[in-house]
Structure formats: C-alpha cells, structure tokens
Amino acid sequence: MTTPAGTAGYGEAAEQLAVQYESVSFAEVHRELYDRYPAPPASVLDIGAGTGRDAAALAALGHRVVAAEPTPELRAVGQRLHAGSGVRWVTDALPDLPSLVADGERYDLVLLTAVWMHLAPDEHPSAMAALTRLLAPAGRLALTIRHGPVPAGRRMFDLPAEPTIALAADHGLRLLHRATRADLHGRDEVHWTALLFEREALSGAPAVRSRSEAADIGPSSR
C-alpha cells in the first residue's frame, strides 16, 4: 500500500501520540454522538483507528470491531496496548479503502475520529463513496472535523462542515446530529464539529436500534 500523505509525521511520533490519545476516554471523545450509536452487538469499522482506544472500548461493549490503520507504528502500538480486546486490525487507507471495499463486509457503524481533516477537498468525493459502500442499510457514519491552525509537519485541511454535510446528502446519507465541542487536549485554537449520518434502510428491513432506543425498551420488553 502506498503511504498516504495524511499520515506524515505520525509514524515517528507513535509512542508519544499513544500517550496523548489514550489520555482521554472513548466516552469523552464520543459524548455528543454516543447515545445515537447502534446498540451492541453491532458490526463496527473504525477508520484511522490510531492506537485502538475507541475500537477496544467498543469491543468491550460487545460490538464486533474492525480497526483500519495505515500507519504501521500506530497499528503496532494499538495491537500491543489492546491485546486481547478482540479487535481485528487491518491495513487500509482513505480515500478509496480498496481492501475493505473489496472484502464486501458492511457495517452498522463506521467511525472517522480526527481523520477527515487529513484528506484534501478533491479526495472527499471518492472517500464518501467508499464510506457509503461500507455502510449497511440504516448504518451510521460518525465523523469529526477539525477546525484550527495546521501543526507543522502535518497534512491537514481546516474546512467548514457544510461541504461535507452536502456531500454526504449527495450519497444518500441523512444528517442525524451535529455538535460542536472544544478540543479535549486543551488547545484553545482548535475546536471540532461532530457529525452523525445514517444510510437509508432497505424497504421492510428492521432499523438499526441506537443505544438510546435500546435503553427505552426495558429488560422485561426485550
């Protein structure tokens, strides 16, 4: 696999980044969207999984999780830190995700946490097409967009959320929720937009139940 331009600067800093990534919890990072994620057990794909913090947390909740990470050093750290988590690690990268698309599996939830900003705007259409192909009917796509100055030595793009929302709509993905939050690492100049989309369900097919919907159904009703 050709080294993606967006991974520049990550391999050599993998150990330091692991400390940073693992210093915040899955619950903190996903608090704006988490209640709308599918209830377990669901099939989950974490793209740009980094050190596997989110993938391992979701696996611990009972989901079947695939973690895709193109940077070998980060992937190795993740496999070490979260050994025994049950996460299946693969090597693949945006914008086209050729291995995952060719595999043919479809997912109830696809995550792109702090990933989208590494793609140039002209890569977004092919990336969104690949993501849509990986979603099961009624599957959900959770995506965060970074706003703020680009660090030296990194390939990032500071873009508004609206073009991504419009692009998702063009691919049949409906916006379910949008939220803005401060940076969890205390960088005052950085903030984030969290977006959750849903692919249309097949006619007559059961909808994917979210955590909040599952919680509304008491144990005696299940």
Which functions belong to the PLM regions below?
Residues 1-102, 119-126, 130, 140-222:
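Class I (Rossmann-like) S-adenosyl-L-methionine-dependent methyltransferase catalytic domain
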Residues 108:
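Conserved acidic residues
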Residues 111:
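A conserved beta-strand element that flanks and buttresses the S-adenosyl-L-methionine
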Residues 114-115:
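Short catalytic micro-motifs in class I SAM-dependent methyltransferases
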Residues 133:
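Short, conserved loop/helix-junction motifs that constitute active-site signature segments
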